[in-house]
């Protein structure tokens, strides 16, 4: 360690240099390194996840607080609940796979065919399934075709001995700001894509997450707001949050004491926030399945109280009701 006083007495130039080094070191312990100002490409591809002006990729840190924020927060038990990272090493988290033009595509039989994209889908007997091949539950499957930058998502997916079936399915052009038809589900209850809202290990290690994060609530309203396209509830009271509601970690929440990787995630929650996308446990947020996730990181994130969040009003960011393009007022 430098003794800055003695250096100042003996060598003024070295003292100045030492001070700079100390300042840099101090900053590096409090602010996550930002490797980029835009979201990273999907590993194994050159595909970014939607254009930079997509609502998922929009900074909402300056937006006004939603007038229903307090009511929504109470309905989500924010006074007695902490964040819960719903991902980790196998079998936790959402798996995805990268495909290309040579990957065989198949037609899938859908339970909700009228609200599903016909495909075909690059889905096969070895495609990773949420929870594992023998799992129950939602059984999401996600595939990114690197040759066309197309995202394919399935809900309740089964290979079924070569006759694949699923509850629903959706296909997304990752280079465009398209939304699904209003009223359509997807592989998620909100009618939104899942993959853009997942925390990925590669993003955290690169030092920057430039998108909103998917999360769930136990009780949601029978309503959806932009950019969501679908809802799944029979609760009518306005105290319940609708699908598509966006929340952010309050700017004043201190990141002191959190590890570098935890600060990367929490900084994203301050700037890009969380989007309510499905019914589930209150304040569970999602990431990819990855053996490199450390329990020490996940445990830190569980220390964040839900009361440190607030809902925002992003209605002014909407360019068109039928587009995911966003332009928020500065």
Predicted segments, located by residue:
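Short, surface-exposed polybasic-aromatic patches that bind anionic ligands, especially phosphate groups
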Residues: 39-330
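Secretory targeting and sorting signals
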Residues: 2-37
């Amino acid at each position: 360690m430098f003794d800055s006083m003695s250096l100042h007495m003996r060598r003024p130039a070295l003292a100045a240099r030492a001070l700079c080094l100390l300042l840099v070191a101090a900053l590096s312990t409090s602010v996550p390194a930002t490797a980029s100002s835009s979201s990273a490409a999907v590993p194994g591809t050159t595909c970014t996840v939607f254009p930079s002006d997509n609502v998922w990729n929009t900074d909402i840190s300056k937006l006004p607080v939603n007038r229903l924020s307090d009511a929504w927060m109470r309905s989500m038990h924010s006074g007695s609940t902490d964040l819960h990272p719903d991902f980790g090493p196998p079998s936790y988290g959402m798996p995805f796979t990268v495909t290309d033009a040579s990957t065989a595509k198949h037609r899938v039989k859908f339970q909700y065919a009228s609200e599903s994209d016909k495909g075909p889908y690059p889905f096969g007997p070895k495609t990773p399934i949420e929870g594992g091949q023998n799992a129950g539950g939602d059984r999401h499957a996600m595939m990114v075709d690197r040759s066309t930058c197309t995202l394919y998502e399935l809900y309740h997916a089964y290979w079924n001995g070569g006759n694949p079936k699923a509850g629903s399915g959706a296909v997304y052009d990752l280079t465009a700001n398209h939304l699904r038809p209003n009223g359509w589900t997807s592989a998620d209850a909100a009618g939104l894509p899942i993959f853009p809202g997942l925390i990925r290990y590669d993003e955290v290690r690169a030092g920057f997450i430039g998108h909103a994060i998917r999360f769930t609530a136990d009780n949601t309203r029978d309503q959806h707001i932009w950019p969501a396209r679908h809802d799944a509830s029979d609760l009518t009271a306005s105290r319940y949050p609708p699908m598509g509601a966006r929340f952010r970690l309050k700017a004043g929440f201190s990141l002191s004491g959190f590890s570098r990787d935890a600060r990367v995630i929490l900084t994203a929650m301050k700037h890009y926030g969380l989007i309510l996308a499905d019914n589930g446990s209150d304040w569970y947020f999602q990431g990819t399945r990855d053996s490199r996730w450390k329990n020490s990181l996940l445990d830190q994130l569980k220390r964040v109280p839900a009361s440190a969040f607030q809902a925002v009003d992003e209605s002014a960011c909407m360019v068109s009701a039928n587009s995911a393009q966003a332009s928020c007022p500065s």
